[in-house]
Amino acid sequence: MLILIETPKNLLPFKFNKTSSSISHGANNISSILLNLFINDLTIHKIIVSDISDSDYKIINKEYASKKNTLITPYKNLKSQIEKTEKIPDICINFDANITKLIHFRNINKYTYPIIGLIHSLGFYSHFKTIELTKKLLQEYDTYICPSKNTQQSLINFGFPKKNTAVISYGVNTTKFKPNNNKTQLRKDLSIATNATVILILGRVSPGLKTDLSPALKLMPNLVKKHPDLILYIAGTVLDETYLSKLKTMSKKLKIENHIIWEPFPDHKNIQKYYQVSDIFLSLSDCCAETFGLTVLEAMASSLPVIISNFAGYKDHIKHKSNGYYISSYTADCNLENDYYNPSNKEFGEIYSQSITLNYKQLKTYLLQLIQSPDLQKQIGQKARETIKEKKTQDIMYNSYKNLISHIINKKNNEEKFLEIPDYINISDLFSHQCSHQLTYNDLFYLTNDTKEKVEKESHFFFFENQLTNYDLITPIIFMLNTEPMTINQLASKLNKSKTLVAKNCLFLLKQTFIRANMT
């Protein structure tokens, strides 16, 4: 078998100069892991094409590649390299969604080998534009590997043929991600109280590109009142400094700043230590581009009980109340088109995030159950690790890739398949399957008691000013709900506004816990 692999230079396991090495994480980490597994597999012959220079090419092939049944070449030499081997690749793979360059190379040269791409992130306009470019160029057995069934469904909703997709879960290194028996010393090293109950949130700090953290902070005062030794440990690269500043201001006003540890510069090389010092893992993702949630698997492998949203790519991670807990997620049909087709991923990410709300009553209940019972923490955590070892290790992931490759090669033919693509789609329909519950226009909405008090006292609300430009019905909705509960239909009628616009504002208010709905 001869496999053609396309990869960027920065993922190659070589040091071209003193400054070329870097620590990859997230999607890049998965791509790097898969690349290394293929390179080190001596049973497979590979040609690797990359954006390397001529000098890089000489160094690599002289010192390393010949020992690994591997040839590495720059793009300009790819055709001649294939001719030298006197064998056309059986299949081609890129551990990324952008496979257009490979497709063009194949089609121009009239090769017929299948091409595989990997979807890491899918939800923004820019992501779907990449997919759109490939659709009309596909052949029969070209395939996108999706890390979750949810991601596959997003492709299908977009109009992508199911037969050109496959689902393979990510896997984690259970030797690296495991419990550490010396938690006391680890906590001392990180200046964390040894007797504290630590809830870990690990991920990018951004209101729309991972998780809006503000609702979780609002739960803390009540939890801390019952459990004064509680610590919320938030570790993640900060993508929005202004947002972080506002979260810190909020924590001070809520008087919980002494119960929060911020780690804005996590050590990605030793990322496992953050799991090993913690007791509970919390991930409430509401990002439209969430395809999997690798940190959830890392936490489970580290024997942490996880509490996660049953949103998007998270849906298949756990069995509820057995090896973790799911929090219900809600949305409604609200007009997202104008924001989606805006080229700013950040702006759309924030707006979409505020259109997703979770059942925070459930979250509080499950957190209290775990906080109050170290035995339950241990029991759920052990089952979580067993799940990973049985179903989601790196070896299982790699073998699944090899099995899929063999299957595609065996079934390939020379028929080219050109696919149609809609020019315009309803974005709410595109993401309609992401949440577990769909609010209707007839659901009743109420003000929370806290909001009623603030209205009566004319107190300050915790709002993020930049978001208010997208939600201009907040004030009238609050004052109307202060008189009586209403549905979206009723609010839209009284305000003489569209139902989708009212729904958008109501979801924001739900997200920020200013109102509640008759959610089960």
Regions found by a protein language model. Give the residues of each.
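Nucleotide-activated donor-binding/catalytic signature segment of Leloir-type glycosyltransferases, i.e.
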Residues: 68, 235-236, 244-269
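C-terminal amphipathic helix plus adjacent low-complexity
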Residues: 344-354, 360-480, 487-490, 519-520
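A short, active-site helix/loop in glycosyltransferases that binds the activated sugar's phosphate group
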Residues: 127-134, 138-167, 172-176
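A short helix/loop element that forms part of the nucleotide-sugar donor recognition site in Leloir-type
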Residues: 178-192
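Short hydrophobic beta-strand element within catalytic cores of glycosyltransferases
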Residues: 305-308, 318, 325-326
